[in-house]
A protein has these predicted regions:
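Local sequence-structure signature of Cys/Sec-based thiol-disulfide redox active-site neighborhoods
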Residues: 1-21, 26-31
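Thiol/selenol-based redox catalytic cores and closely related redox-interacting motifs
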Residues: 33-114
Length: 116
């Protein structure tokens, strides 16, 4: 299992603490330094079953600076994937990848359900 996180993100810290407390092994990947590429994002999106917009870090500085809330509705999926792949800080985190399961963000109940 892989977990894409940003070390300064409090939500990521909570997620990692939860994984550790539940003795769940994972590979930690720094989303800022080693973010998923476009091909990987397409696979993760398909596995997640979520709308692509859920993969965007809507509370992030880059999201706000680029005014993505206004731009995303007019973007194609290909454009969105390219944008997500361009900078890990645009991607919602933590991003958990476990075989055929993908979780975006940390909601303890969702993680409990999928990982137990």
């Amino acid at each position: 299992m892989k977990v894409y996180c940003y070390s300064k993100c409090t939500t990521c810290k909570k997620a990692l603490k939860w994984l550790d407390e539940n003795k769940i092994k994972y590979e930690l990947i720094d989303i800022k330094e080693d973010h998923p590429d476009e091909k990987t994002l397409k696979i993760l999106h398909k596995k997640s079953g979520l709308p692509l917009r859920r993969f965007f870090n809507t509370s992030g500085l880059i999201y706000r600076e680029m005014e993505l809330s206004k731009k995303l509705p007019n973007m194609s999926e290909d454009e969105m994937f390219k944008l997500l792949a361009s900078d890990g800080m645009i991607v919602k985190r933590p991003l958990l990848v476990a075989d055929d399961k993908v979780l975006v963000g940390f909601k303890e109940e969702e993680w409990k359900t999928l990982l137990r």
